[in-house]
Each structure stands twice: as structure tokens, then as C-alpha cells.
């Protein structure tokens, strides 16, 4: 008895007749019962760590890398040996986007602006030849908050009598995820909040101010002297990811 490759799992009955060679009419009939088992499936958990969401989709790996069907690497597509069945998507954090699993390729992707945190995707890996032969496992994606650099600034001197705006912006040496910090416009990646106002050198006189766009303004009539403003620069996606700096 031979079981060809690609035979679906199940019970097969083969009826055959055995006859005596010397007396060909002396025969008996029997049934050979063949049980074909489904292939063993190994769907192993996956963990992708130290991932940072960027401004474009970030492919972090493939869920099938450590999965096997009948001892062979699990593969998808026309000539593959497996399919990805039902997927339970990750739970959003703060209503933001979540990592995704592509059922056609097994690729795991972290979309732009995905909040920092741990995400779990559950998926089912099934044998292509026997679609009901499946195993489930989980993918864990640990997304880190991007690094914020908030550099201290020393503004060029401004005439306090007439006032004005220094040509240097407080955000000029600040960055998030190695990209320039932007607090305004259609796609800001950070927020700027003044933490400590400048202290007046004379009672009732104006002091320099700092806007949410990083612009320092010196009002006319500001007494000469050195002023310090402390501000906090925060990640627009992860509001608790912040750094302080001074102007």
C-alpha cells in the first residue's frame, strides 16, 4: 500500500481480491483500511520588541518564521502548505492604530503613529491540504515611545526698548525619533508647553514669552538682562513621553 504525497487526511478502504495462482477461481475478497492522519502543525508564539512607530508603516517581521507544517517551514500562497485563518486583532491604545498581521504573507507591520505599549495578535495557522487541521498562537509586539531630544537654547540679544523676535526658534535643535520637532501645522509630531515663565527683573515690566510654535517674543519695554524660560516638549502620540529644556 502506498499513500501518495498530498493525500488528504481521512480513512480509506481499498477492496481487493486474493486468488490462488494454481486455481484462479479459488479467491477471497478483503478490505484494506488505511488511515491518513493530518500533518502536525507547530504554530509558535512570536515576540517583536524595541519597535518604534515611524512616519511610514514599519514591517517588523514575519509570523511564520518559526511555524511548521509536517516538519517543514510553513509557507503561504499557491504552492504553500498552510493558510492563516481567523485573526483576533490587537486592542487599540487610546484609540490609536495597532500592529497588523497580513494573512496573505504573514508579515507583521506597525503603522505610523502607533502609541507605545504591548500589543497581542492571535492567529490560526491551518494546513492547506486539511483546512480543519489548525493551531492557534499569539504575536506580541512591544512598541516603544520614540526618543525626544530637547536642547537648551541661548537666544541672540534683542533690543528690549523696541522689542522683537529672535531669529532662532526654540525648536531648531529639538527632535523626535531623529526627525525635527514640529508642533504646528497639519501633522505635528510634538507639543510644546511652557513649564516655567520668565521672571520679571522689574516689577510690572514685561518678560520674554515662548509660544507653542517655539517662537520667543520680547515685548517693547522689556528691561535688559538675562531671562530663562523652561518648556516641556512632548510626543504628540505618547503624551507622557516628554523632555524639558530651557530658553
Predicted regions mapped to residue ranges:
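Extracellular interdomain linkers/hinges and stalk-like, low-complexity segments
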Residues: 14-17, 22-74, 121-124, 128-185, ...
Amino acid at each position: 500500500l502506498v499513500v501518495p504525497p498530498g493525500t488528504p487526511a481521512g480513512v480509506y478502504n481499498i477492496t481487493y481480491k486474493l486468488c490462488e495462482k494454481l486455481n484462479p477461481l479459488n479467491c477471497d475478497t478483503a478490505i484494506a483500511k488505511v488511515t491518513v492522519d493530518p500533518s502536525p502543525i507547530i504554530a509558535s508564539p512570536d515576540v517583536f520588541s524595541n519597535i518604534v512607530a515611524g512616519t511610514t508603516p514599519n514591517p517588523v517581521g514575519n509570523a511564520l518564521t518559526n511555524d511548521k507544517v509536517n516538519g517543514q517551514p510553513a509557507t503561504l500562497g499557491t504552492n504553500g502548505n498552510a493558510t492563516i485563518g481567523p485573526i483576533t486583532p490587537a486592542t487599540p491604545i487610546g484609540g490609536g492604530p495597532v500592529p497588523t498581521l497580513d494573512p496573505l504573507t504573514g508579515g507583521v507591520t506597525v503603522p505610523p503613529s502607533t502609541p507605545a505599549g504591548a500589543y497581542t495578535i492571535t492567529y490560526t495557522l491551518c494546513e492547506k491540504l486539511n483546512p480543519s487541521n489548525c493551531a492557534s498562537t499569539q504575536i506580541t509586539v512591544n512598541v516603544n515611545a520614540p526618543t525626544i531630544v530637547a536642547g537648551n537654547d541661548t537666544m541672540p540679544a534683542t533690543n528690549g526698548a523696541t522689542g522683537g523676535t529672535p531669529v532662532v526658534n526654540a525648536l531648531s535643535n529639538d527632535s523626535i525619533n531623529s526627525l525635527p520637532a514640529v508642533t504646528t501645522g497639519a501633522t505635528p509630531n510634538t507639543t510644546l508647553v511652557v513649564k516655567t515663565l520668565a521672571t520679571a527683573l522689574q516689577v510690572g515690566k514685561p518678560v520674554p514669552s515662548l509660544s507653542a510654535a517655539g517662537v520667543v517674543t520680547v515685548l517693547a519695554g522689556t528691561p535688559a538682562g538675562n531671562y530663562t524660560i523652561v518648556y516641556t516638549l512632548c510626543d504628540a502620540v505618547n503624551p507622557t513621553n516628554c523632555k524639558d529644556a530651557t530658553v
